[in-house]
């Protein structure tokens, strides 16, 4: 209700520099809400003074004669304040004025002086001055930081404690003026603290902080799920209100406590569900990597059905784990920063791979009697030195080794390179051992643990028998190529920008002479950049049938019709179209449909024939378009190659703009009226033809009857 705005400058005794707000927005709002103050000097004041946040408001009794007593704001001497602008509402008996120009600032607040004088007499009484005091509660701005802890079932928000009295053990927080607000706008869920506690919320206050626990399934929290990945967003406001002050703790958070993690021999893949936020950067260790530098730093992304981040295993750490017999890859304190609803929001997770096994026992041995496997240098930390790889106690070497990517591939015989054989149940198991040294051992002392060892295994089913045979196959059949379904559409647009076509329910459209009609033919459901849409002919008819007569040519053989005085103009699709070759845009002037200076009186229907061409190798003579048409003869079109499309509805042409001046040409009233006239004229013609036919038949019957009478006589 404030009409004037008052700004307060606040500085701390310590002379601290300007505070800055972090991702947590904290606002401390002070107000004195409808507090009726005692009148220290004259208890007979005929009204109630209210000290609001930005102004002073005096509400007089309805029995008070405002015009007679004329209340006014004055200084301590009773003189009117020159620059004070106050509002006096005679109907509602209310006087309002701002603090800045109508009060006197004193220690701790503002002095208010009101004079009430009888305007019907010149006699002044000494008790017509009233003095009041409005307290000023200063606002404080604090440099603060929030702590958000995300779990799958709970979010914990911690805010700094501002007033020690809130931590008073004698205070019953459930009865204080606390309100919890989850969400934003009209969909926000607002709860008094007492109701919130019943629904699983919890508020903890100590001398250092205020902590609110919010259940993850609370109304107002938005959840996003994809496969086994979970992410949710929450916008929180925690409000504390008491006499004369209002504190608002505000936070906006993204939580991803349970993202899907999958690991293979080369990468860790992190799956983030699709939601309106955009991932801007990732932080781990000492690195903060923006999106445009991910690939260069070993992070690749897949943005289909959500977002998948692939971290090279060389970026990961390893640790011993009680649940893993060997070691485990992980990323510590991975910080994901998103741009979401105008804010930069971060969440921290600790993704881990499943246990790494040094033994591979589930692979079938190759049919040629060999065992195939791969070794990566980053399978351990420190990395392996691939030049020191050995197979068992032999000198067998990998068949393929690339140091740049840290890969070595082996193809070792089952009867060589130290491969051992044993029987387990119905399986014949072959195993060998790979060992290598680390590139940078942790110390200069060499222990057995300084050498990397990995057991590799494969198996055959015990009753399997190896057979060698040569099978001669038939030659592969030749591919049969047949064009797929071709789907085209013809549309009209309001202007040359080609932003939004007219809908089907907007037809028939109304156009005047000299107005261009912007049309577009495009290919639907095709994303092949090698195909191109080529126009053959475009024409207009007075009925829906494309083959009806008369016909007015617009485009012939892919070019403007040369016999038109006002020729068709083609427009390029431009960079806004995903595949510009899938579009043909042009406009036609309505002069093309005027004969002997008279406009058409019926609806006009437009049609086009077109075909799809292969830009790599032109597969039809119709694909070769050379304009103008006078440079070549009329092309012979194969009807099987082309497809004819029509506008969704007709266009109504008006020959004279002045005849409908001041009327919207797209008005449905004009359209209905002219269509009605067109239908009426056609109906009248049909009735006239029917009457004429009846007269002729009657005349023939009359002649036949007369002839019969003469013949009988």
Swiss-Prot record:
This is Zona pellucida sperm-binding protein 2. Residues 364-630 form the ZP domain. The keyword Aminoacyl-tRNA synthetase does not apply. Keywords: Cell membrane, Cleavage on pair of basic residues, Disulfide bond, Extracellular matrix, Fertilization, Glycoprotein, Membrane, Receptor, Secreted, Signal, Transmembrane, Transmembrane helix. The gene is Zp2. Disulfide bonds join 51-134, 84-102, 365-458, 396-417, 538-608, 559-627, 613-623. Component of the zona pellucida, an extracellular matrix surrounding oocytes which mediates sperm binding, induction of the acrosome reaction and prevents post-fertilization polyspermy. The zona pellucida is composed of 3 to 4 glycoproteins, ZP1, ZP2, ZP3, and ZP4. ZP2 may act as a secondary sperm receptor. Coiled coil: none annotated. The chain crosses the membrane at residues 684-703. GO terms for molecular function: acrosin binding; identical protein binding; structural constituent of egg coat. PROSITE patterns: ZP_1 (PS00682), ZP_2 (PS51034). Glycans are attached at residues 83, 172, 184, 217, 264, 393, 455. Expressed in oocytes (at protein level). Its main location: membrane. It is a single-pass type I membrane protein. Belongs to the ZP domain family. ZPA subfamily. GO terms for biological process: binding of sperm to zona pellucida; prevention of polyspermy. Gene3D superfamilies: Zona pellucida, ZP-C domain, Zona pellucida, ZP-N domain. Proteolytically cleaved before the transmembrane segment to yield the secreted ectodomain incorporated in the zona pellucida. Residues 462-484 are annotated as: Disordered.
């Amino acid at each position: 209700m404030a009409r004037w705005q008052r700004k307060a400058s606040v500085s701390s005794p310590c002379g601290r520099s300007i505070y800055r707000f972090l991702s947590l927005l904290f606002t401390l709002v002070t107000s004195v809400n409808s507090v009726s103050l005692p009148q220290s000097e004259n208890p007979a004041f005929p009204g109630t003074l209210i000290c609001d946040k930005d102004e002073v408001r005096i509400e007089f009794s309805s029995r008070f004669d405002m015009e007679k007593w004329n209340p006014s704001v004055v200084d301590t001497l009773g003189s009117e304040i020159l620059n004070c602008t106050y509002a006096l509402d005679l109907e509602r008996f209310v006087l309002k004025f701002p603090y800045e120009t109508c009060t006197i600032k004193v220690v701790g607040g503002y002095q208010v002086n009101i004079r009430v004088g009888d305007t019907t007499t010149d006699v002044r009484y000494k008790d017509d001055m009233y003095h009041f005091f409005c307290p000023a509660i200063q606002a404080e701005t604090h440099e603060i930081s929030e702590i958000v802890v995300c779990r799958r079932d709970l979010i914990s928000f911690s805010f700094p404690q501002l007033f020690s009295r809130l931590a008073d053990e004698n205070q019953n927080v459930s009865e204080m003026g606390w309100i919890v607000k989850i969400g934003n706008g009209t969909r926000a869920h607002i709860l008094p603290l007492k109701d919130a506690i019943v629904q699983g919320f919890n508020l903890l206050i100590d001398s250092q902080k205020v902590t609110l626990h919010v259940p993850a399934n609370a109304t107002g929290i938005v959840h996003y799920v994809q496969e086994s990945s979970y992410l949710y967003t929450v916008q929180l406001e925690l409000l504390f209100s008491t006499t004369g002050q209002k504190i608002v703790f505000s936070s906006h958070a993204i939580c991803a406590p349970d993202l899907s993690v999958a690991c293979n021999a080369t990468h860790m893949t992190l799956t983030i569900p699709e939601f309106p936020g955009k991932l801007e950067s990732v932080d781990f260790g000492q690195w903060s990597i923006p999106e445009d530098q991910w690939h260069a730093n070993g992070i690749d992304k897949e943005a289909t059905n959500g977002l998948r981040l692939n971290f090279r295993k060389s970026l990961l750490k390893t640790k011993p784990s009680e649940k893993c017999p060997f070691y485990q890859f992980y990323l510590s304190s991975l910080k994901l920063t998103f741009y979401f609803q105008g804010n930069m929001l971060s969440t921290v997770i600790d993704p881990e791979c499943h246990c790494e096994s040094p033994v591979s026992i589930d692979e079938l041995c190759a049919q040629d009697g060999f065992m195939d496997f791969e070794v990566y240098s980053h399978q351990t930390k420190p990395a392996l030195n691939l030049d020191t790889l050995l197979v068992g106690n032999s000198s067998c070497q990998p068949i393929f080794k690339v140091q740049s990517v840290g890969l070595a591939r082996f193809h070792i015989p089952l009867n060589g390179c130290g491969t051992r054989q044993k029987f387990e149940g119905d399986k014949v198991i072959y195993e060998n051992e790979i060992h290598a040294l680390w590139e940078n051992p942790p110390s200069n002392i060499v222990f057995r643990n300084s050498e990397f060892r990995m057991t590799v295994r494969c198996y055959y089913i015990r009753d399997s028998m190896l057979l060698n045979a040569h099978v001669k196959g038939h030659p592969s059949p030749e591919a049969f190529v047949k064009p797929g379904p071709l789907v085209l559409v013809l549309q009209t647009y309001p202007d040359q920008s080609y932003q939004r076509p007219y809908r089907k329910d907007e037809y028939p459209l109304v156009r005047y002479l000299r107005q261009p009609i912007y049309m577009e033919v495009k290919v639907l459901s095709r994303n092949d950049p090698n195909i191109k849409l080529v126009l053959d002919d475009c024409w207009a008819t007075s009925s829906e049938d494309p083959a009806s007569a008369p016909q007015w040519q617009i485009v012939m053989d892919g070019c403007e019709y040369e016999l038109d005085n006002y020729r068709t103009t083609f427009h390029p699709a431009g960079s806004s179209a995903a595949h510009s070759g899938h579009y043909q845009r042009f406009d036609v002037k309505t002069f093309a449909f005027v004969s002997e200076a008279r406009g058409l009186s019926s609806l006009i229907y437009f049609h086009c024939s077109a075909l799809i061409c292969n830009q790599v190798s032109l597969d039809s003579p119709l694909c070769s378009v050379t304009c103008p048409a006078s440079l070549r003869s009329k092309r012979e079109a194969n009807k099987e190659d082309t497809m004819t499309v029509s506008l969704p509805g007709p266009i109504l042409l008006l020959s004279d703009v002045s005849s409908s001046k001041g009327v919207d040409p797209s008005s449905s009233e004009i359209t209905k009226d002219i269509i009605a006239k067109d239908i009426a004229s056609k109906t009248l013609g049909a009735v006239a033809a029917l009457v004429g036919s009846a007269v002729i038949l009657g005349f023939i019957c009359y002649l036949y009857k007369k002839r019969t009478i003469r013949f009988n006589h």
